[in-house]
């Protein structure tokens, strides 16, 4: 089974990966795709900022942050067993997560229930949208979920 773990770089996303690792049997998971999605609107300055002339640098920094977020999750899962890949997409987070799951024929999507970021207020609940549109099971990990000792191989 392929598993998609969505991350926005938050502590909650990292906790969601640790939670999966704490109870899932790594022998039933063939691969894990760690996915971060950058919003195309994230590179657009606020109206009060005007044109900074640094759009290319801003886009690179958003992508670098997304790559760092996927690398952090991949590091947590590195010694666990299943093959881990990392991907950064651009678009609506919920849409891109669902698309990635369909493309990989994922058996499970893991997502944190909230990131605590201001962008979550503007975009609504990514976890809720994924839950309503995914064609596979979705594990929504709430803040404070207790992580037990990881399942052994």
Positions of the model-derived regions?
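Short, well-ordered secondary-structure micro-motifs
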Residues: 16-17, 43-47, 98-99, 121-122, ...
């Amino acid at each position: 089974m392929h598993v998609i773990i969505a991350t926005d770089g938050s502590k909650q996303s990292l906790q969601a990966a640790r939670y999966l690792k704490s109870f899932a049997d790594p022998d039933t998971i063939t691969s894990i795709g760690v996915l971060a999605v950058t919003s195309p609107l994230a590179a657009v300055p606020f109206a009060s900022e005007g044109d900074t002339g640094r759009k290319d640098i801003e886009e690179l920094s958003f992508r670098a942050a997304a790559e760092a977020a996927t690398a952090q999750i991949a590091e947590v899962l590195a010694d666990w067993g299943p093959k881990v890949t990392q991907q950064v997409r651009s678009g609506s987070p919920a849409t891109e997560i669902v698309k990635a799951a369909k493309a990989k024929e994922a058996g499970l999507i893991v997502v944190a229930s909230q990131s605590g970021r201001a962008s979550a207020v503007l975009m609504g609940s990514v976890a809720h949208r994924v839950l309503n549109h995914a064609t596979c099971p979705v594990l929504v990990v709430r803040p404070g979920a207790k992580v037990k000792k990881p399942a052994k191989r």
